[in-house]
Amino acid sequence: MTDLTSLSAAELAGLVARGESSAAEVTQAHLDRITAVDDRVHAFLHVDTEGALDAARAVDARRAAGEPLGPLAGVPVAVKDVLTTKGIPTTAGSRILAGWRPPYDSTIVRRLRAAGTVMLGKTNMDEFAMGSSTEYSAFGPTHNPWDLSRIPGGSGGGSAAALAAYETPLSIGSDTGGSIRQPGAVTGTVGVKPTYGGTSRYGLVAFSSSLDTPGPCARTVLDAALLHEAIGGHDPSDSTSIPAPVPDVVAAARLGASGDLAGVRLGVVREFAGEGAEPGVLAAFRAAVDTLTKLGAEVVEVSCPHFQYALPAYYLIAPSECSSNLARFDGVRFGLRVGDDGNRSLEEVMSATREAGFGPEVKRRVVLGTYALSSGYYDAYYGQAQKVRTLITRDFTTAFEQVDALVSPTTPFVAFPVGARTADPYQMYLADLFTIPSNLYGGPGISVPCGLADGLPVGLQVMAPTMADDRMYRVAAALESAVGPFTPPAL
């Protein structure tokens, strides 16, 4: 009998639609897998067993009644614990939100339910999406299924690790500086940051509002495209949502899977193809570029000179926005409250709550952001960073006048051991060196497995113009079809 957890989302949806397997059977298989391996991986913070089975049985009832099913009906999905889920704990990986059960679903979750997917639960993450290793979660680190002594990337390491451990065929993440793509790269899975505004932020616990982008994670490019199609599109509840339809990413993925890139012009980012990455990562990337050429793509070198300033600009813009966004967590309305013994002032209670509720990385970024926005320093730091952001956007605009898409390694290194970089924030921040530019620009990016280095996965990143997400899906699917899947060791 076929192991249901080994199948793609598209394959599982087909089984359910044809009646060859029930949604309940598919869901139970994945719940059993979570029970079997998640004590070692720790991808999930909360598993909604009864809710998942109820949703699966509802899909089976619809099929039995002859109702039409969507392309992902009956397929399990895991959701990063940064998106609100009605009645289900949402912590953003922080002690300050421990036990909070939101009264509403985020738009992404609402669309997942409407598509007939089955939500298994919430996945682990760096606190408030601030981190690159999922070691900054208040509830303990997640481990990489390729090597349990190593990190799964971050901030959305739980969503990526759950895929690599075959606990779910689909998951949802959020990407502020690389938090979907970087975990995808180091776990050998597919991670997508859609165009900013192409997926709704309504119900997303905010880190950096001008950068945060929810997106799909999967084991195949087609599965990611199907999930992207389900969650994308305009949402009037999000003022930054783009009033335009989702590009036809599913058709693009299917076209790319044919392995034909004739007529596609790709640019290798010169500044990201040399120094700054491990030799094994560069070797795998260069081999993948050779493969893209063999598939018919024309590959040229493109210079984006201001990309080198993206990392410092990001670490002024994002902390500045987070220092404002996180001011709402004060212990007054919801979540953790400390020191409310009747003998302290409201200000003292708020201070004690934040001291106990926020972890060290969150505190570091809030302090940095508060300083950058302070009187006398705003123009020198935040203002200058926004000017750099404009220059990076111009680099992208100029590049896309020459090529259809840009390619680079997704991350400079493979998964490193748990604990290896927590004492050095700068080394941790370098994990997002290649992914941050797309966030500052607002365009889409996808990470697709392209090879191995030292037995660990390496990802290739494809970046496209805003609202041209279909371009990157075509390129990623073509590469995937040529290099094949990369399967982690059995757990």
UniProtKB/Swiss-Prot annotation:
It is an enzyme of class 6 (ligase). The keyword tRNA processing does not apply. InterPro entries: Amidase, Amidase_CS, Amidase_dom, AS_sf, GatA. Keywords: ATP-binding, Ligase, Nucleotide-binding, Protein biosynthesis. GO terms for molecular function: ATP binding; glutaminyl-tRNA synthase (glutamine-hydrolyzing) activity. The keyword Cell inner membrane does not apply. The active site is at residues 80, 155, 179. Its EC number is 6.3.5.7. Gene3D superfamilies: Amidase signature (AS) domain. It catalyses: L-glutamyl-tRNA(Gln) + L-glutamine + ATP + H2O = L-glutaminyl-tRNA(Gln) + L-glutamate + ADP + phosphate + H(+). GO terms for cellular component: glutamyl-tRNA(Gln) amidotransferase complex. GO terms for biological process: translation. It comes from the Bacteria. Heterotrimer of A, B and C subunits. Belongs to the amidase family. GatA subfamily. Allows the formation of correctly charged Gln-tRNA(Gln) through the transamidation of misacylated Glu-tRNA(Gln) in organisms which lack glutaminyl-tRNA synthetase. The reaction takes place in the presence of glutamine and ATP through an activated gamma-phospho-Glu-tRNA(Gln). NCBIfam families: gatA. This is Glutamyl-tRNA(Gln) amidotransferase subunit A. It comes from Salinispora arenicola (strain CNS-205).
